[in-house]
Amino acid sequence: MKTPTRVSFEKKIHTPPSGDRDAERSPPKKFLRGLSGKVFRKTPEFKKQQMPTFGYIEESQFTPNLGLMMSKRGNIPKPLNLSKPISPPPSLKKTAGSVASGFSKTGQLSALQSPVNITSSNKYNIKATNLTTSLLRESISDSTTMCDTLSDINLTVMDEDYRIDGDSYYEEDSPTFMISLERNIKKCNSQFSPKRYIGEKCLICEESISSTFTGEKVVESTCSHTSHYNCYLMLFETLYFQGKFPECKICGEVSKPKDKDIVPEMVSKLLTGAGAHDDGPSSNMQQQWIDLKTARSFTGEFPQFTPQEQLIRTADISCDGFRTPRLSNSNQFEAVSYLDSPFLNSPFVNKMATTDPFDLSDDEKLDCDDEIDESAAEVWFSKTGGEHVMVSVKFQEMRTSDDLGVLQDVNHVDHEELEEREKEWKKKIDQYIETNVDKDSEFGSLILFDKLMYSDDGEQWVDNNLVILFSKFLVLFDFEEMKILGKIPRDQFYQVIKFNEDVLLCSLKSTNIPEIYLRFNENCEKWLLPKWKYCLENSSLETLPLSEIVSTVKELSHVNIIGALGAPPDVISAQSHDSRLPWKRLHSDTPLKLIVCLNLSHADGELYRKRVLKSVHQILDGLNTDDLLGIVVVGRDGSGVVGPFGTFIGMINKNWDGWTTFLDNLEVVNPNVFRDEKQQYKVTLQTCERLASTSAYVDTDDHIATGYAKQILVLNGSDVVDIEHDQKLKKAFDQLSYHWRYEISQRRMTPLNASIKQFLEELHTKRYLDVTLRLPQATFEQVYLGDMAAGEQKTRLIMDEHPHSSLIEIEYFDLVKQQRIHQTLEVPNL
């Protein structure tokens, strides 16, 4: 804004009366006598003194009278506060058109549409402005006589130094000038000011703050320490549902962000599924919730859909507004009671929903100890030549069988008789269904059925029913009332989504019932949910093997359904372990969490670098899409400083598009970085521990925590390091093994591709995870064996030389059964 320039005119100045000029008027005494005494104060000191000449004045007479000066001073403004940056207002130009163009044909003034023009005006091909005319227009528009009438005239005022050729451009002409100005001012006054955190380290990953990636933000904590935004987000994700904040590794205090806007931002990312591990360009479409291979529309194209966590369903809207959305990790929240709402009407479902909790009676609940007739593991003691006691564990080989093999009974009948018996049992099943369920023979052939719960909103569940899938319909059948609750044509299914580990979400084409939830018992077989998902998605499927028709035999044992089928319960409940079945094929390999350790300090230079890159590429080729890889590099830190330091990246899957860039930037440093191989190995293990703790957010859920085989692979350019006689190395080794549950192995880099390929294949066969032994009444020692495959044997030394008991406890997680097994075995005495 600028002060308008007025046309020069004669200035009339008022001159106060003078005593010499107006002697006939009243003297000054009368003038002063009429004023208040508070206006003028007498100054006796000056009255007594005669004004001396300049030559005889002493220096002391120039001392000012402070009291007199302060009494005559006005209000003093506050001094400027220069502690904060001063942002002057933008120099916006007030725009208006010419005076002539401001009047219409009727003589009326046109109204000014906007007092400030922040849009870029086209100044090309405009003649130079006449300065005299512009000044005249400004003086007219701002004059007192025309202020009210001409204040809205649209005048275009151009600066005289504006270049007509268009090379010059004013910043305030940008349409985003006000937005960017507000953002810049906020940035100067906020926590995200462009600071330089020199010498500070992240309180989580202990990397220097200067080692951040492009676009990384820094979080200042209440404990006066700093951390990377993504590092804090990963730990915050693990503790959010517990109502806790991370603890600072430096001072041990609870670390909360100083900026109050950071916590709501992180909570928003967690609730929308955009956590720390989803940021950046590493998003892999194959790892999303929806299986894109089978989530096609009926036209064969990929449908455009809203992420499940952001869907607004009709059941979420009530007279109270929106309900709390049910998230994929909703089992972390308390159940909230809402007003009972009726289940949506026909044509599919015609019964009111009940809210009975999904709970089996005591005799129906699965007990791992009772369910396993014989242990899959064999344990025994032995002694070495030095009289040291060893304990050995071996898991039995897996017995493979085809789909007909599970039908074999004790008489071992031939395949022809098996086929005949299967046809007979299938016929009885069809007769039972036709008599009790499909009386009009409209549903088609039977595919499978199980005892499941269903819901239309994911909150209120209907129990005591069978979900039966036919070739034409999905039928909801109440086996207590022996009546059909609802039927859904198979061509009405649009998408089938894995909502969480226990729930399937079926999106329908109907506007009456847009979706339906199917809930599985948490103790059911691992393959039950993928099997139902596969069968619902493949509309052309018409039959399954007899052993796959029903899986929830335990839940249906108290109902007369199994007996009416005419088949022995143990035969019907026998589940095939054939990995060729479609819903088992993708889950045959154990997912891995693999940490690969690389030493960049070597004398061979570029030759050694090529060997390292070749080994890493071989590992990437051998990993599956659901495996997670982390790389630890020693010889420099995260900012590139060469020294006895280490840095890491991960855990990320093999399809991350940043692996190529990361590997291309690896450079070999001088060979004298570490004193010896033990120091190098110690730094390697310490960096691995930092990576393991940073990626621990993946282990928050039990299904995920026990679903990975964890392995640390140290690629040595020379001999393998011995840690038995170094206590510091052994302590770091035990921390990774017992606390973070990682197995550690050292291998020399070889040019043979088969070596690494075979190593990864062995890791993918680890079925029994987190195997742990305890010796009750003998010692409090706990022996950790790690992950084991079927047929694998491991032996460990125990400290107790004379065990006092023949009993030993073994605990492990069976990946195939998705159950944690805890057993007490009797071991033969030595």
UniProtKB/Swiss-Prot annotation:
Domain of life according to the entry: Eukaryota
Gene Ontology CC: Cdc24p-Far1p-Gbetagamma complex; cell cortex; cytoplasm; mating projection tip; nucleus
Residue numbers carrying Phosphothreonine: 306
Alphabetic keyword roster: Cell cycle, Cell division, Metal-binding, Phosphoprotein, Protein kinase inhibitor, Zinc, Zinc-finger
Gene disruption phenotype: Some mutants appear to be defective in mating because they are unable to locate the mating partner.
Entry keyword annotation includes Cell cycle: yes
Protein name as annotated: Cyclin-dependent kinase inhibitor FAR1
Provenance organism: Saccharomyces cerevisiae (strain ATCC 204508 / S288c)
Originating gene: FAR1
